[in-house]
Design a protein with these regions (language model features):
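Mobile cap/lid helix-loop segments that border enzyme active or cofactor-binding sites
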Residues: 1-63, 88, 180-192
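Preference for long, well-ordered alpha-helical segments
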Residues: 142-188
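Acidic/histidine-rich alpha-helical segments that form the ligand environment
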Residues: 109-150
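Acidic/His metal-coordination segments adjacent to aromatic residues that form catalytic metal sites
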Residues: 95-109
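Short amphipathic alpha-helical boundary/capping segments
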Residues: 56-61, 104-107, 134-139
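Short acidic alpha-helix initiation/capping motifs at coil-to-helix transition points
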Residues: 25, 43-48, 78, 113, ...
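Short, thiol/selenol-centered motifs that function as redox-active sites or metal-ligating centers
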Residues: 66-89, 152-155
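Alpha-helical scaffolds flanking conserved acidic
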Residues: 62-69, 143-148
């Protein structure tokens, strides 16, 4: 069981339940469990779902690069469901293997630099210096570089957060489900 007990499907609000069921049916999500956790904050569940639905649709980097980044982020964050799922038809097992060994494979220069950016942002963000940005600028526009950075930051943060929740943990939850925990807040001390 995750650290925070997922909201049971039959206890979800109609909006949250529709988001989770349609997302899983459409193949956007490999498992409903993280979404059942995010449903504690309906606003954030909806925002996350909107972001996921936009990914690769009309964005400047394209679906293949964004999918490679999502998988690499999952590898770095040790998110098993996301490592195993493929959300873009062009991604092969060979492509995924290339994410672990950047010297081999058939990745394009844009793909290789995108994955390298993700790796550096994860492990040594100080190495993303002027020279690296100049290298990026040889194959990307400024708008694509911004999209790359924001996509990597969002994906990496999400996978690390999901990892901390122990989505597939076997221990009892630290925070048990209670309906009064959904879309509510404890007033900060000293605030009237």
């Amino acid at each position: 069981m995750p650290i925070i007990e997922p909201i049971p499907m039959d206890e979800l609000s109609p909006v949250s339940r529709a988001v989770i069921e349609s997302g899983c049916e459409e193949g956007l999500y490999a498992t409903p469990i993280p979404l059942q956790l995010f449903a504690y904050s309906t606003r954030h569940l909806l925002a996350m779902d909107d972001t996921r639905r936009l990914r690769g649709s009309g964005l400047l980097l394209g679906g293949r690069i964004l999918e490679l980044l999502r998988i690499r982020s999952a590898q770095l964050g040790e998110c098993q469901p996301c490592m195993q799922s493929r959300k873009h038809d062009s991604i092969t097992d060979e492509d995924v293997a290339c994410l672990l060994d950047m010297d081999g494979g058939n990745l394009t220069e844009q793909e290789r630099l995108s994955v390298r950016f993700m790796d550096l942002l994860s492990a040594d963000h100080h190495a993303i210096d002027r020279a690296f940005y100049a290298e990026l600028a040889e194959v990307f526009t400024a708008a694509q570089i911004i999209e790359l950075g924001l996509s990597c930051a969002g994906s990496m943060g999400m996978h690390r957060f999901i990892h901390t929740l122990e989505v597939f943990g076997t221990d009892e939850p630290v925070v048990k489900y209670s309906a009064d925990q959904v879309d509510t807040a404890v007033e900060p001390v000293g605030v009237a």
